[in-house]
Amino acid sequence: MIGFVKQKELLDLLEENSENTKCYFEEVKNKNEDYIYVRRIEDASIPADNTNFFIYNRIEITVYSKTVLKRTNLCRYINSVFDTVFSFARANDIYTATCTVNLKVDEWNASP
């Protein structure tokens, strides 16, 4: 889904980072410095190394265009839900979970 959001609404959304909603926000490392908002929808557990690990098997990703936000009070965004499996790595006591998803942006430059 592609849509638009007012600048104030976006800033309010990005300031919310409640543990209860399991929503996370971080800057995407691309040349446009867009923003990504990730929401965990469902959990599933898988056994690994005789321990149960939780993976996010369904996530919702919304990407907000920072470039448009700078020019106008509207910000373009694209939203999609993914079913994905995370891979895990461990370094000492630090665990990381990663996954790769492809979000196709056909109409990113559409007008509001």
Language model features with spans:
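Short proline/glycine- and acidic-rich turn/helix-capping motifs at secondary-structure junctions
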Residues: 29-32, 90-102
